Swiss-Prot record:
Residues that coordinate or bind substrate: S10, K42, A79, R93
Protein's pathway: Cofactor biosynthesis; coenzyme A biosynthesis; CoA from (R)-pantothenate: step 4/5
Entry function: Reversibly transfers an adenylyl group from ATP to 4'-phosphopantetheine, yielding dephospho-CoA (dPCoA) and pyrophosphate.
EC number(s) stated in the UniProt entry for this protein: 2.7.7.3
SUPFAM superfamilies from the UniProt entry: Nucleotidylyl transferase (SSF52374)
Name the UniProt record assigns to this protein: Phosphopantetheine adenylyltransferase
Originating organism: Beijerinckia indica subsp. indica (strain ATCC 9039 / DSM 1715 / NCIMB 8712)
Length: 167
């Protein structure tokens, strides 16, 4: 039986922190599914299709070096239902600090009640990426700052193009 992990998020944009979690999951699992949550009441910077393309492009080299399959998909609703539909046994989450731990433990407990057969595993963020959030990256980029230290190169290029002001 292969071990399949589901990693959910908005990934708007994909950050080096997300890449850290995906890389850790790739070491342990046979397949990692990156599931982009779609919330019709929010207006993301990148469209769902753009995020899929960026994740596939950024993660391609990582998965080429591991014996692990990557897939990217959209989902709406509960993460445990998305995991069940995808055949994933694991939900993977990253932890940057204590506030992440508090929130993620509550979510893991709720998910465990709803889906006892699906486990949640946590990866502590590497110190180099602990401070990165997609919200802050969007703010830096939309205010004309250089977001490249916080995102994969393909995402930095897309951010620069998306947020460039017309001359």
């Amino acid at each position: 039986m292969s071990l399949v992990a589901l990693y959910t998020g908005s990934f708007d944009p994909l950050t080096l922190g997300h890449m850290d979690v995906i890389g850790n999951a790739a070491v342990l699992c046979d397949e990692v599914i990156v599931a982009i949550g779609v919330n019709p009441s929010k207006t993301p910077l990148f469209t769902a299709q753009e995020r899929i393309t960026l994740i596939e492009s950024a993660c391609g080299p990582l998965f080429a070096s591991h014996a692990c399959k990557l897939s990217v998909r959209l989902f709406s609703g509960l993460a445990v239902e998305a995991a069940r539909e995808a055949g994933a046994q694991l939900l993977v989450r990253g932890l940057r600090d204590g506030s992440d731990l508090d929130f993620e433990m509550q979510m893991a407990s709720m998910n465990r009640v709803m889906a006892p057969d699906i486990q949640t595993i946590f990866f502590p963020a590497a110190p180099a990426v602990r401070h990165i959030t997609a919200t802050l990256v969007r703010q830096v980029a939309t205010m004309g700052g250089d977001a490249s230290p916080f995102v994969p190169p393909v995402v930095a290029a897309a951010l620069a193009q998306k947020t460039s002001l017309p001359s």
